Design a protein with these regions (language model features):
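Hydrophobic transmembrane alpha-helices and their helix-loop junctions in integral membrane proteins
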Residues: 1-33, 42-263
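Short phosphate-coordinating micro-motif centered on Lys-Gly-acidic
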Residues: 38
Length: 263
């Protein structure tokens, strides 16, 4: 990509995107997590829309923007609930209060909702959309419009696994909401089955790797549903490294065949 006219802009966006993800992984305050979550969505959108003169790229960026906004909306709802119920944004203080809220209900209109279950639904919905789970996976194959280094970041080592990392970070909460674990198992199983079956019928090599990523993230979410958080975190790191190298290799292959991605 040394011949690209805006190579400096790409390098700036890649560094900002990676910094946002690192910030998300190390912060232990819900407000900072929300801030990093928004930054990840913003910079991923700018990376997908890097070739902004292409019609298909603009459509892919719009699709990414819509799903990113939905994910951010559920994250913001969870943040507001944490302020109203926990009266703090520090995760360590929130986790200490969770056992005492096992029978706490909130009222929305004339309906009573179990607070921990509703709170966990907001979190897994936000993380599931970002992790391209079933019904929210459609933005990920189109995100291949980004340059290959950005695709390696978005698809493997940062963006999609950020949703899984969010679920692992709030794993204490899911120990008190058993039905949420069932939802994670169901969604993860559907995603890994759909991603692997759909990938078999792909002729585009980049989309084949994209659906492979969707399938592997389904494995991770399903493992979170079984409360195997240590194993999921280990597999997350291994998958991120291997898939990042695979994307770079695919990009080199496409470049070798003069941009042809049809297998």
């Amino acid at each position: 990509m040394y011949r690209e006219a805006f190579i400096n802009r790409l390098l700036y966006l890649l560094n900002l995107f990676a910094t946002s993800v690192i910030f998300l992984f190390f912060c232990y305050d819900f407000f900072l997590i929300l801030f990093a979550w928004e930054c990840i969505g913003l910079f991923s959108l700018l990376l997908v829309n890097f070739y902004s003169t292409r019609i298909y790229t603009i459509k892919a960026a719009l699709k990414t923007f819509i799903f990113s906004r939905i994910s951010d909306m559920f994250m913001f709802i969870a943040f507001i609930l944490s302020l109203l119920i926990f009266n703090t944004t520090d995760l360590s203080l929130m986790f200490l209060q969770i056992p005492f809220l096992a029978f706490h209900y909130i009222f929305i209109g004339h309906s009573a909702w179990h607070f921990l279950t509703f709170f966990s639904y907001c979190l897994i919905t936000s993380g599931g959309i970002k992790a391209a789970q079933f019904f929210a996976h459609v933005w990920l194959p189109d995100a291949m419009e980004a340059p290959t280094p950005a695709s390696a970041l978005i698809h493997s080592s940062t963006l999609v696994v950020a949703g899984v990392f969010l679920i692992i970070r709030f794993s204490v909460l899911f120990e008190f909401t058993l039905f949420t674990n069932y939802c994670l198992i169901l969604v993860g199983a559907l995603t890994l089955s759909f991603g692997s079956i759909t990938g078999v019928f792909q002729n585009d090599i980049k989309k084949l790797v994209a659906y492979s990523t969707i399938s592997q993230i389904g494995y991770l979410v399903c493992g979170c549903g079984f409360c195997c958080y240590e194993e999921v975190l280990l597999y997350l790191i291994i998958h991120a490294l291997n898939k990042a190298f695979l994307f770079v290799l695919v990009g080199y292959t496409v470049h070798f065949f003069n941009g042809n991605t049809d297998m």
